[in-house]
Curated annotation (Swiss-Prot):
The protein's Enzyme Commission number: 3.4.21.-, 3.4.22.45
PROSITE patterns named among the record's database cross-references: HC_PRO_CPD (PS51744), PV_P1_PRO (PS51871)
Short motif (Involved in interaction with stylet and aphid transmission): ranges: 450-453
Record site: Cleavage: F397, S398, G856, G857
Residue stretches making up the Peptidase S30 domain: 255-397
Protein name: P3N-PIPO polyprotein
Domain text: The N-terminus of helper component proteinase is involved in interaction with stylets. The central part is involved in interaction with virions and the C-terminus is involved in cell-to cell movement of the virus.
Residues the record marks as active site: H307 (for p1 proteinase activity), D316 (for p1 proteinase activity), S348 (for p1 proteinase activity), C742 (for helper component proteinase activity), H815 (for helper component proteinase activity)
UniProt keyword annotations, A-Z: Host cell junction, Host-virus interaction, Hydrolase, Inhibition of host innate immune response by virus, Protease, Serine protease, Suppressor of RNA silencing, Transport, Viral immunoevasion, Viral movement protein
Motif (Involved in virions binding and aphid transmission): 708-710
Amino acid sequence: MSTLVCQAVAAPVWSNGARTRRIRDADGEYRCTQCDMGFDSMTMARPVNHCCDGIMIDEYNLYDDDPIMHLVDSKTPIKRGSQETEGDGMAAEAIKVTGAEPVNCFMVGTIKCKINENSIVAKGVMAAIPRQLTQDEVFMRKARLQAAVAKSTIEREEKERQFAFSKLEEKLRARREKLKDGIVIKTRKGLEWREATPNQQRGKLQSTSFDASGGKTLTPHTIYCKTKSSKFSNGGVKCATSKKMRTVRKPQSLKMKTESIDVLIEQVMTIAGKHAKQVTLIDKQKTNRVWIRRVNGVRLLQVETKHHKGIISQKDASLNNLTKRVARHFARKTAYIHPSDSITHGHSGVVFLRANISGSKSYSIDDLFVVRGKRNGKLMESRNKVAWRKMFQIDHFSIVGIKIWNAFDAEYVKLRDESVSDHDCVGGITPEECGILAAQILRVFYPCWRITCTKCISNWLSKPTSEQIEHIYERGNLAIQDLNKRIPSAHHVTQMVELLRQRIKNTTFDMGNNTKVHELIGHRQDGVFRHLNRLNNSILAANGSSTIEWESMNESLLELARWHNKRTESIASGGISSFRNKISAKAQINFALMCDNQLDTNGNFVWGERGYHAKRFFSEFFTKIDPKDGYSHHTVRATPTGVRHLAIGNLIIPGDLQKLREKLEGVSITAVGISEKCVSRRNGDFVYPCSCVTSENGKPVLSDVILPTRNHLVIGNTGDPKLVDLPKTETGRMWIAKEGYCYINIFFAMLVNVSEKDAKDFTKFVRDEIMPQLGKWPTMMDVATACYKLAIIYPDVRDAQLPRILVDHSEQIFHVIDSYGSMTTGYHILKAGTVSQLISFAHGALLGEMKMYRVGGTQKMEINMCCCQRKNLLIKQLIRAIYRPKLLTEIIETEPFVLMLAIVSPSILKAMFRSGTFNQAIKFYMHRSKPTAQTLAFLEALSERVSRSRVLSEQFNIIDGALKELKSLANMSMRTQHTYPIVQNQLDIMIERVSADAELLRDGFVVSKGRVQALIEKKLSRRPEKFLHRLAICTTIATNYVIFKSEAWFWRIVRKQRLELFQGSMDGAFELIFGRRQTDHPLGAHKVAADVSKWW
């Protein structure tokens, strides 16, 4: 600003009108245009680069070193740029604002001056200086000029700010609308927008309403400050702002102890060895691929070497520190000394401890020894660098495959013909697939275990030609199937093998089967036999065909003819006499017992984790046998309806051969022939697995003495049984199933086929879900249903073989034979041999008596022995549960038939109705068992009818009238609970008593039972009150409240119904006496109803 003032006062000009400036003074210094200080550089001479105090007053009028405007004549042509013109215009405007007036008339910049007519300035001569200003004029002009410049600067900056913020406002308007309903929070990653919670939105609304209530709007405004007169504003100064630095958080390093690292190494390598996987060990950008290898029964680490990859180098391998640590971890576990002769092909890369190898060996750099091969009988270390000539003398222990490939490649190239095709060969089959093709073809024509074995070659050549042809035919079929699945593009090989198979097989077949078919059904031309004879004649006419399907067609035709012949005979007879159910001569195959991974070195089944989880069966459903007491306690196995003699006593072997032969004679029962009890039908056809086994003549096959074994699980119902060692227990004692739980051996046999990972869930499910539902001596239908449930959850158990199951038709019992055999003979044998066949008993469409047989016997004897005791105990438990919700819930969920024992007393029925017991039970079984829910609904209706009656004899009559219907509903419900037979027995007793009383009354006798019923009811009615008084105060209050509410609701309904009944009776009486209805009588229904309501 001071510069503009100086420019307005005086300026040197040249004659041509151009502005000039003294760059340096006489002393050669640069001068400041404000304070006239001298500097050595032009940069420091600028006012902004030093503490400039401005020009002094005394120096102002004498200052002539500034670049000032030229005063030019009007006739002098001036060529100026647009920027210079604009600057002169601003200076002129500033002079006009300050009110400065030049002498006579002159212009600044392009303004013409007419001081004289002639040119006032010659070339290189300064123009005349205007008159000297006083101190006050200079101060006033400075102040006005400063204010004008400040005002124009503020206006320009305001316009720029508004322009900049208008653009920013447009960009941020959409974002501000989006963020209106949310909040911006600061997180570790920066600022984030989140949707505002209801409380935050409420706070924003309150703050908005508070601002609106004031009626004031805050707008940005500018505050101007007056500066001192001795200072001049040079505009804003750019200031540096602080920048938020990103904080880099270093991840915490994981530190493990040596023991933890060893455990980690052991677990990782164990998993890798179990699944035959390779592990890559990385340490400081050096990697080693390793795996587990057993050498002489010891687990050691094997490292991938260069000659594994087909690279022969002087130094075969290198180990990083981590690999060395893992190798030492495995090598130090054993002190076994490995002879050098036992280390052979396949052991290259195995890491031993050098001290654990005996024999000739090369040196090693540390205590480890990595096998490479042998040279002159000496073991070579892979990490040692060998000479070039010695490298090819080493017999590497894994280079056999490379030798085969090199020989094959060289021979194939030598034998192939020159290419005469018109195309370029393109590789479409990988070398690995070529190796598979060569192996398959070699296996078809050359079935040797090792291709280098001369003994295998001799054995193959010694076989007859027919066996060799048969092998090529069968093996070729397997090769075709394998190649079609693995290498679909190898159709040229499969086509040639198939062509060879068709040629080597004899195209003719034996016509003996056709002759047998003609002998069987040739004379019959009715129905389907006419078509069968036509098919037989067509086959005879097509003899000599080259396809193999004709032979299978002959065999199928023969079986079809036999089946139709037998079926026709059976339908014609229409009886059981034609039933044949021969047992298979071959034992069924159980693949779980054939898997090598589940067998030990002796071929015995290895339970693994299954044996550990099988303890749940032993602890709950088995009893220990103490050999010290002898086996006499277990020789006779009692059942509820009889006994069965076990062969456990035969484990004691006498020295006398005669006595030993006597033990082979069993205890025979009465033999029973084949009848309808022995068969099961579905849709009119026999279901053979659910029927008894017969011989070829139709007679039943009877069981013989079954020899015992010690600590074995005997499975297999046909053929020779299979013995599986029971899981080893801590005590090592013998176990026998508890009475009524002999069917646990079926689930034990299913455990063999369950995988180890599912063994825990399987045993828990059987113990906690299946066994409580079945209980003691369940029916075969219930056992089959449980097996069906397990087969859905664990599909592997469908093929599980069953123990031998014997059938006793006289007592309607199934005996599941365990390892202690049976001395009792004469039982029928059930044909079902697998779980899937046993599940057929669960079908509702299956007809036959055997599905209702008990597995172990019925419960009649047990019920008769302690019927009264158990019934009284259950009634007492039921009364206690009326006012105890937890006990009541347990009874409802486990034994719902206990609720039916409430029919022994009307007071128990009324108490259960008032407490809502039946309603709770109905809700529980509504979607679980509809028959059970219907039975409970009938009990609720019966208890309501009993509650409405006030007379004891009438209440008993209501109960007696509903007994038959209640029994029919109970028969349709689930019968797997333990209390079902007790309830059924109580119902039978009450029904027989009612029928006997009715016969006595019909014959004219008087039945006096009122006093007995009153005494029983008096005794039972006190028990609910007695148990109610024993409850806690809070429980008593809650129970009384529930009873009060239910009684109030019930008597409100009863009172209304009785009132309606009484009004109906009164209407009939009024109409009969007065000839009109009581509503027309002065003593209307309102008064009568009011009086009656008072009475009731």
